[in-house]
Curated annotation (Swiss-Prot):
Upper taxonomic lineage: Eukaryota, Metazoa, Chordata, Craniata, Vertebrata
Record's subunit section: Heterotrimer of alpha, beta and gamma chains, each related to PLA2.
Entry function: Heterotrimer: Snake venom phospholipase A2 (PLA2) that has presynaptic neurotoxicity. Inhibits nerve-evoked twitch contractions but not responses to cholinergic agonists acetylcholine and carbachol and to depolarizing agonist KCl. Causes a fade in tetanic contractions. Displays a triphasic mode of action with depression, enhancement and blockade of neurotransmission. Does not display myotoxic activity such as changes in baseline muscle tension or inhibition of directly stimulated muscle twitches. All subunits are necessary for maximum toxicity.
Tissue specificity note: Expressed by the venom gland.
Subcellular location as annotated: Secreted
Protein name, as recorded: Phospholipase A2 homolog P-elapitoxin-Aa1a gamma chain
Length: 20
């Protein structure tokens, strides 16, 4: 479960926050 390289920490974090 490794996120894409340099995907966009802000967008990635937002996605995780949305899941929680």
């Amino acid at each position: 479960s490794i996120p894409l390289p340099s995907l966009n920490f802000e967008q990635f974090g937002n996605m995780i926050q949305c899941t929680i």
